[in-house]
């Protein structure tokens, strides 16, 4: 399946919503982050959003020959599950991401946790026999930009919008899954 650039950008934005939400939280809970620490957030989130679809793709290619006839259904259910999980997590009231100080350990855990969805999208890319470099690069760049932007916006706006962006990201992934399913 040849996915258009617009679809790839939409997927990247949807995947970046978790990192954006976490970054918003960091912005309004850690007012003392330096510019270099903010840059680390962007780099870590961007890198893991880039690499996890690659890992998912590698895993997906090992099974794609067995499931090529059901690939659209698998893609749909993967994106549906990811989207619903993002929405469910956003409706939970606990603020699991809030911590008081900057640490690379925490940053790595947050970057991995927010990129698990990208791993599943990588499996979907493999099942749909998509190219990998352009989508992963766009996903990483968008996550980088959204992470840094989220921190700056969070510093200015506070806690009000965090969960709503994650709901939007989940809804977009579900809609993309439906689009993939209807395209076959």
Swiss-Prot record:
Keyword list, A-Z: Cell membrane, Ion transport, Manganese, Membrane, Transmembrane, Transmembrane helix, Transport
Subcellular location: Cell membrane
Membrane topology, from the record: Multi-pass membrane protein
Pfam (any one): Mntp
Chief place where the protein resides: membrane
Membrane-spanning intervals of the chain: 5-25, 38-58, 67-87, 107-127, 133-153, 164-184
One annotated GO molecular function: manganese ion transmembrane transporter activity
GO cellular component: a single term: plasma membrane
InterPro entries found in the cross-reference section: Mntp/YtaF, Put_MntP
Functional description taken from the UniProt entry: Probably functions as a manganese efflux pump.
Similarity comment: family membership: Belongs to the MntP (TC 9.B.29) family.
Designated name of the protein: Putative manganese efflux pump MntP
Name of encoding gene: mntP
